[in-house]
Amino acid sequence: MSSRRVLPTKINLISMRNQLKLIRVIKRLLENKREVLLIYLRTYVNEYEKIYNEVNEALKEVYDSYMKAVVDEGIGNIETIANSQNSSLQLKSSTKVIFGVKIPITELSEASIPPKPFSEVETSPYLSEAYDRMRETMVKVIKLVELESTIRSLVAELRRTQRLINAIDTSILPFYNNSVKYIRSILNDRSREEFVRLKVTRRILQRRRGDGR
């Protein structure tokens, strides 16, 4: 929108100045929000990387123990034990809000984790070891999924916030600044013209008074 479309009046000048102040306040708030979002984002990314590395190492250990159990028990026996179990894991989901961003919270219900479907005495100790390690790791895997979703939400909100700041910088602020300058320029020109007009009028009146004597 062109600043020249704004009617150059004192009322509009006052209104534009007030709106300009408000826009600058909004921009500062958005910039503060951006900084806070960046802090949260860095925190969650660091946590994600830490847990990811832990899960990666833990899964390697689980796989190593599992393969040793396969050697001891045979793949057929292992598959029979695995197929005897039903899918019973249950997750509890909720959300929390950070600066207007909905953050998912996911927890594994401990009660839904089935007990070991085999006897530790009759089966390979490596199988029991793989089970225990996998049970511990499952909680972290779910935490990773939660963190990934959180990071995506924060990044999306950060991008929206940055777009608003960019719009203010490149479009809104220039329009209001130019409008204020335009109105002020027109009013100043009018004021100068009025001053010159009054000065000329005063001289004419003075001449007339002089001629009337």
UniProtKB/Swiss-Prot annotation:
GO terms for biological process: proton motive force-driven plasma membrane ATP synthesis. Transmembrane segments: none annotated. InterPro entries: V_ATPase_D. GO terms for molecular function: ATP binding; proton-transporting ATP synthase activity, rotational mechanism; proton-transporting ATPase activity, rotational mechanism. It comes from the Archaea. Its main location: membrane. It is found in: Cell membrane. Keywords: ATP synthesis, Cell membrane, Hydrogen ion transport, Ion transport, Membrane, Transport. GO terms for cellular component: plasma membrane. It holds the Pfam family ATP-synt_D. It is a peripheral membrane protein. NCBIfam families: PRK00373.1-3, V_ATPase_subD. Belongs to the V-ATPase D subunit family. Has multiple subunits with at least A(3), B(3), C, D, E, F, H, I and proteolipid K(x). HAMAP family: ATP_synth_D_arch. This is A-type ATP synthase subunit D. It comes from Metallosphaera sedula (strain ATCC 51363 / DSM 5348 / JCM 9185 / NBRC 15509 / TH2).
